[in-house]
């Protein structure tokens, strides 16, 4: 019998200028708490690539052309009961038409 995880690791990719807005949004929705600490996260710089298909409106670059943009990879923890709200907050605060993010279950 498999039980649901108590928490998840949320990883998202964002341009540096939107870092604070996305962090503020996910923290306000309940992410980033570890014991008595709040707003816990980790981030590092990298390069994101994407090619917007027909009918897309990329915030950066143009549809039909592969783009390479500097981005940050941001990680934080999310309690299972806050996951849906945190993901909604991330999508609302993120500047991209299709935000890239991953959710990983954490072992207890």
Language-model features: where?
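Hydrophobic structural segments
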Residues: 1-108
């Amino acid at each position: 019998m498999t039980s649901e995880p108590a928490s998840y690791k949320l990883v998202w990719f964002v341009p540096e200028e939107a870092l604070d807005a996305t962090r503020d949004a996910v923290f306000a929705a309940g992410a980033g708490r570890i014991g008595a600490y709040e707003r816990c996260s980790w981030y590092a710089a990298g390069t994101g690539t994407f090619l917007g298909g027909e009918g897309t409106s990329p915030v950066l670059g143009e549809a039909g052309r592969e783009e390479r943009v500097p981005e940050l990879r941001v990680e934080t923890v999310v309690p299972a009961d806050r996951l849906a709200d945190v993901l909604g907050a991330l999508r609302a605060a993120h500047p991209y038409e299709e935000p890239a993010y991953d959710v990983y279950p954490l072992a207890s």
